Every structure is written in structure tokens, then in C-alpha cells.
Amino acid sequence: MKAYLFIFIFLFLLNFLILFFVLKTELIVSSLIAGGYALFVSAFTSYVYTKKVEKLLGVLLYFAEFVYENRQNLEGSVFYSPLYEELRDIVSYIEGGIKNVKSSLEKQLADVHVEYTEVVEKLGQIMEVVERLKQGEIEYGALPTGLDPAGALGEILRESLSEIAKKIDNIKRKIYELDDTIKKVKNYAEAGEEELVKAEITRTKSILEEIEKELEFFK
């Protein structure tokens, strides 16, 4: 709480001095704008760092949806409006791909490589979206000019997106493990190694469960 209070006081004083002495804004107006901005940033900082990481993507999706639906009213702001649709579609596709992998495994192991290849491609797409966000594609142009909000908010957003990137990389590694176990099942089956086939099938199912558990982060 002390850290957030310090952030509030620091930002208030900094922005008040800029508005009042540099931009020659009236005293009351300078106080209101500086106070509002400082309150927004400190509250946003508190929110990001006290929420569980598992809720982060849901917050981003909600924020993207809000901005997309109200983009006509946000004059002067720049926001990547298709972001919400991309994230939702990609996460849904990954979940569907995992279900298809499980179904294919039960029917015919030879077809599974097609499913996980498509899932890896989609993971690449969502990584591109995360990288665009980390590089500052979102600008808060609707806020008062001269306050440079992208510095404080952008840093918080980049740190949060790094956690998402780690999760995605972990899922990709598990999918490659799935590839290896499926190849082993095929080779052992051709060699007539029944016990080894059973062991690798058990391992394959375990990897699928691990991937599904990782995907809970994005719900």
C-alpha cells in the first residue's frame, strides 16, 4: 500500500508541475488532471500486481472488448481493434485442437501429427500478438498530452505479457514432446513391442492432460 501511495504522490506532483508551470494550465485544472492521472496509474499498478496471473488474459480480453465496442467514443486513441477477436479465436482453436488430438489418438495414431502441427501454428500466431503488445502497439492517446503515460503503463503491460509468453512456450514444448511419443508408439507398434506401445500411449495421454492444464491459464 505504501508503494502505491508513493507512486500516486510522485505522479501527482510531477504532472502538476508540468501542467501548471510548463504548460501554464490553470491551478484547478492542473490539480484535477494530475490527480486523476496519478490515481489511474496507481490503481492500475495495484490491480495488475495483486491479481493472480491466471486472470491476466481475461482482463486483457475484457479491456480489448471494451475498447473495441467503444472505439467511436475514444477520439484520439489508437488501439489494435482486431486484438480481441484474434485472442479469442486462437485460444478457442487451441482448445479445439487438443480435443481433436485426443480423439485422433483413440482412433488412429497415424493422423495425430496433422493436429498438433496446426496447434503449433496457432501458438505461433498468438505469440505474434503478444509480441506486438510488448513492443507498444497500444497507445493511450486519449489521455492529456504531455503526461507520457506509455512509460509507466507500458512497462507494467510488458512485464505481464512476458508471463503469457512463458506459458505459450511451455505449451509448445509439451506439444513437441507429444510428437516424439507418437512417433515412438508407431515405431514400437511396427516392431511388435506391445508393452512399450502401452507405456508410450500412457505417456501420450499424460502429456495431453498437461497441455490442457496449461490452457486453463487462458480461460
UniProtKB/Swiss-Prot annotation:
Domain of life: Bacteria
Predominant localisation class: membrane
Coiled coil: 155-218
Lipid bilayer topology: Single-pass membrane protein
Membrane-spanning ranges: 28-50
GO cellular component terms listed in the entry, alphabetical order: membrane
Keywords: Coiled coil, Membrane, Transmembrane, Transmembrane helix
Subcellular locations according to the entry: Membrane
Protein name per Swiss-Prot or TrEMBL: Uncharacterized protein aq_1849
